[in-house]
Amino acid sequence: MIAVYNDLLLAADSGQVSALCLLDLTAAFDNVDHDLLLLRLERQYGLRCVVLRWFQSYLSGRSYRVIYVNWTSSIVYIVCSVPQWSVLGPRLFIFYTANLADVVQQYHVNFHAYANDNQLYLHCRRDDMMSVVDRLERCLIAASHWMAANRLKLNAEKTELLWAG
């Protein structure tokens, strides 16, 4: 986020305004498709054999149940998600969503991501703000389609557009 903040300050110093779009993904870590993640780890990052099987073992076989006073729910097996509060969870999410940057960059929009915190931003002159909004809107539509194809969901109600400068 410091890099984004610095870019916004530099743009303001040069007399430009910046549109900053803060993306909110609904239950981001809970929707990571294990098979798709493992396929990406293999094809995009070159993980093979023992290392790939280790990740497969880490992701599979997880379950949970709720115990409350004298009541216990049935066991539910987890077929997708990465553990959010683990050391690996945010990193695996970054690997899973790395291709989103390619989608965003097709629209010449700056993109910064840390785990499930994603920011899109552009700088422009004040008289060019409407074209920036149009480009961001087209970029968000494409990003939303990519997310849907990858079992993720952009929460439009919590996604925010801010102007700075």
Question: Model-derived features: where do they sit?
Answer:
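Conserved pre-catalytic core of RNA-dependent polymerases
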Residues: 1-83, 122
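Acidic, Ser/Thr-rich intrinsically disordered and amphipathic helical segments
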Residues: 3, 36, 50, 54, ...
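Short amphipathic alpha-helical interface segments
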Residues: 16-19, 108, 155-160
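Generic beta-strand/beta-sheet core signal
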Residues: 21-23, 114, 121-123, 157, ...
